[in-house]
UniProtKB/Swiss-Prot annotation:
Residue ranges constituting the 4Fe-4S ferredoxin-type domain according to the UniProt record: 2-30, 37-68
Cofactor stoichiometry and binding remark: Binds 1 [4Fe-4S] cluster. Binds 1 [3Fe-4S] cluster.
Protein name: Uncharacterized protein in rpl9-rpl11 intergenic region
Binding site for [3Fe-4S] cluster: C10, C16, C56
GO molecular function: 3 iron, 4 sulfur cluster binding; 4 iron, 4 sulfur cluster binding; metal ion binding
Amino acid sequence: MSHTIVTEKCIGVAECVNACPVSCIHKGEGKNTINKDWYWIDFAACIDCSICIQVCPTKGAILDKEEPSLQRKLR
């Protein structure tokens, strides 16, 4: 199972990108609905290590489950 970044809660800090050991977190195009940069997780590459959840400053922005409907890849 993979993790999910909730697109509309992401504030674009990108601590998850730097912390991910397999580089499966990517920047999305444009801004989300709160006018912030946003990131998405490649479900196929995620190793479910939970480091992204630990470093994310926004509670609830990264879920410990795969929820494609909450995470978009492109704007």
